[in-house]
């Protein structure tokens, strides 16, 4: 099956300035949102208590809040989830609760009395502030190392500079680990390490690695910005989605890189712009078909998968769309 007919000759390189403007606009919007609103951290990263309840009949959020007053949870927010007829609610409290023996029974009794209907506590999750801080750090490290090692692999795979790539990997990981021992701000450290990594790729003329890491950073940055713009929580499921997107986007990037390398050998007299256009056009149908299949799957997950998987699905919807675009233009 071909969506794009063979022989298509779209001048992607000629349209690159429009793509630069579009990408810069999306990245800027996301950064402004993060600065103005800040990331909305979920229980996993901010710490606190997450409780999911189900009522036998419809109850008001005010009634649930009244029932929570008798339980030591501090300030809490109540949100109805799922269909209205499901009568399911999610309670988020900033204070970690003592979820030991008797807490669930006390909570259930208090909510049932306040609501005037039987309330079942379906799950209780508690994360302490220190654990949340540790999880934030580990999530940032996971994203950083995924980006760097994938870019280094691409360099070794396409430029056959395995020794240079290996030494570079050791230097980057060793430096980041050493500096982290001095209690440096983790976000600042990761940002600085990424800038240094890109500069090193540039200095060592690792063109494929440079292209890979810029493309992946582009996808991750825009996806994070979209999550902030639409007020989604940053949680472990979002980190899983971002790591999945990094691998997914790289898969398409490798296909295009491989075709570029082949066309350089086949058409040595063509300039690089013509080779890139030819390579992207030749892989365009495959790129769109592959990503469209995955995109339709996560759209279904978003609408039919329920509240728990919705944040993950939204990140994948945005990320796959942007990843398809970056495979072609970035």
What are these regions (language model features)?
Residues 1-330:
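A structural signal for conserved, well-ordered secondary-structure elements
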């Amino acid at each position: 099956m071909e969506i794009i007919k063979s022989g298509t000759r779209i001048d992607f390189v000629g349209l690159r300035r429009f793509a630069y403007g579009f990408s810069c606009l999306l990245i800027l919007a996301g950064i402004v949102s993060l600065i103005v609103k800040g990331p909305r951290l979920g229980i996993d990263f901010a710490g606190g208590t997450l409780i999911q309840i189900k009522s036998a009949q419809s109850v008001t959020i005010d009634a649930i809040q009244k029932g929570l007053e008798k339980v030591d949870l501090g300030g809490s927010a109540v949100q109805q989830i799922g269909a209205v007829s499901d009568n399911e609610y999610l309670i988020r409290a900033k204070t970690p609760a003592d979820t030991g023996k008797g807490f669930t029974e006390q909570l259930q009794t208090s909510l049932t009395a306040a609501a005037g209907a039987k309330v079942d506590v379906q799950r209780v999750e508690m994360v302490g502030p220190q654990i949340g801080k540790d999880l934030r750090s580990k999530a940032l490290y996971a994203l950083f190392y995924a980006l760097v090692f994938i870019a280094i692999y691409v360099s070794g795979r396409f430029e056959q500079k395995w020794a240079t790539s290996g030494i570079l990997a050791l230097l980057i990981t060793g430096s980041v680990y050493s500096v982290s021992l001095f209690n440096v701000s983790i976000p600042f450290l990761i940002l600085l390490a990424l800038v240094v990594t890109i500069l090193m790729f540039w200095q060592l003329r690792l063109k494929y690695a440079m292209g890979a890491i810029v493309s992946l950073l582009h996808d991750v940055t825009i996806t994070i910005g979209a999550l902030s713009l639409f007020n989604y929580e940053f949680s472990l499921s979002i980190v899983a989605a971002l790591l999945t997107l990094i691998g997914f986007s790289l898969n398409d990037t490798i296909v295009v890189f491989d075709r570029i390398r082949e066309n350089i050998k086949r058409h040595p007299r063509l300039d690089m712009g013509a080779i890139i256009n030819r390579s992207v056009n030749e892989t365009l149908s495959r790129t769109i078909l592959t990503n469209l299949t995955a995109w339709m799957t996560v759209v279904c997950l978003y609408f039919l998968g329920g509240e728990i998987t919705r944040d993950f699905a939204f990140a994948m919807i945005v990320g796959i769309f942007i990843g398809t675009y970056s495979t072609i233009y970035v």
